[in-house]
Each structure stands twice: as C-alpha cells, then as structure tokens.
Amino acid sequence: MGNYFPYAFEDKRYHTWNYHLKNKFGQKIFKVALDGGFDCPNRDGTVAHGGCTFCSAAGSGDFAGNRAEPIEVQFKKIKERMHEKWSEGQYIAYFQAFTNTHAPVEVLKEKYEPVLKEDGVVGLSIATRPDCLPDDVVEYLAELNQRTYLWVELGLQTVHQSTSDLINRAHDMQTYYDGVTKLRKHDINVCTHIINGLPGENYDMMMETAKEVAQMDVQGIKIHLLHLLKGTPMVKQYEKGMLEFMSQQDYTNLVCDQLEVLPPEMIVHRITGDGPIDLMVGPMWSVNKWEVLNEIDNELARRNSYQGKMNKQSIQS
C-alpha cells in the first residue's frame, strides 16, 4: 500500500496497472503487443473509409509485432526483447493493432488460441471497437474469460459526438454504452481509452469525457495524449490550423484533474501516450515519457491530491 493512496506502491497517488498486476500475480507481468492482421470497420468500408484521423498506418500498433509474421513468432521475439531488460516475469498477450474482434469467431480463435498456449502467458488483452462485438464474439470472449485473465480495451476517445465525427470514429455514444453492457454481462474487464488534445476540444470538454467514464461500469482507463504522427489523416487538419498541441503543463494539470474525478478503484493502465520519434510531428515533449510521468506525480504531490479525491461516490462513502 502506498503512503498516500491505498491502490499504489510507495509515493504513487493513482491506481497503477503495475500495482494491480503485482498484487494479482505476485511478480512482474509483461504486456506483449501483437499484430493479429486485422482491419478496422471504419477503414475497410464496413461503416466508413479512411480510419480514425489520428490513427497511424500501423493501426495504433506502432510498437506491436510484425503482422507479416505468425503470432507465435511475434510473441517470442518481443518476449526476448523484454527479457533483455527484465530477467523474470510472465505475460499478457496484447492484441493491439487495428480492431481485434473485426473477424468471424473462427478467425479470432486462430489468432488467440496459439498464444494462450505459450509458456508463461497468464492473460489476454484485446483492443477493439464497441461496434465490433456481435453476440457470437461476445460469447467466445465470455468463454475465454472463464479460462484466462481477460481484458477488452474499448476505444472511446471522447464523449462529444462533434469531435467523434471530426475524427471519423463512425459510432455514437449509445453504441459504446451497449458494448460495455454486453461485456459486463459476462463479468469481462473493460478498459476505456480516451484521448486528450483532440481537435476543437477545450479543458471542459476533456473533463466531461473523464467524468462520464467515471460513471461507467468499466474497470480500467487509458488516458492518452494526442500525439500526431506522419502519414495520419490528422496531419492535414494540423496543416490547416485546426489543431494545436497541448503544452506539457496544460496536459499535466488536466490529467491530475481527471484523476481526481475517477473512482479510486479504477485501474489506470496508461496516463500518457507516445509514438516512434522518427514519425512524430508533435508535441515533441511527449517523447520524454518518464519526465511526463514524473511531472504528473509531482503535481499530485504539490496539491496533496490523489485519484478519486473529487469523485462523488468516494466522497459520499
């Protein structure tokens, strides 16, 4: 238990993913990012074309394995790289790139099942969209949830439909709520992704997104900073002056405010975002990940604050 917050080690003031995993498994857990070779429904014409305007050619899997290689090969290569830094640990296989339930169940099984048989794999994390959860897929996920440690990561990005339309998400909020409900019916852990710094969004709008997530039946959150990569459709918006990058100070203050309204039990899987430096358009300060994390820690300490301090349910209890 931390000095300031019950769901953290040492001086952390928010519910870290690392804390959660070490408490659950008693050791270091690596998240091994894989590319299952999927597409997205707003890229392939199922619901739209072009994809999300912020999304890279790698489908937001810029640090995932090589999709040209079999899943087992990707897994072993990334595992070996991780063990160059850490000597021991077990693994969560993370299907990160594109939409990882956008295929028939038979295809999903071909992708997921082999990696679950790898030595040391204790769980599975699947990144997808709320409009790619048909009943048969949810039933398969429910079955997986009975035999491995499962998370489904659902991209929300923003609760504001005007922004969602601008970035070509091609789904509405009701679809998101429905997706969460389908998964939670089977007690599947859900991690919601949000992005700070989207075009046209101000502080109040970004806080509204965090406050809405705080009310959802989701067990985790990933807070991303919008970082612009070369080759993404959003570069054109940036060149037209439709996008301004957040400063590090503004981002730090916003994230601390967002943490304060989240329930303390909600696991914070990520609290910033970065991309390959050779593809980065901006903001360049985001590549210094540890500095960003340290500034968030320092600001929470300066405020004598912590995750959930302003959460209504936490205050009432």
Positions of PLM-derived features:
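Structural recognition of alpha->loop->beta junctions
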Residues: 52, 114-121, 208-222, 292-307
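Conserved non-cysteine loop/helix-boundary elements of the Radical SAM core domain that shape
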Residues: 61-69, 97-110, 124-186, 196-216, ...
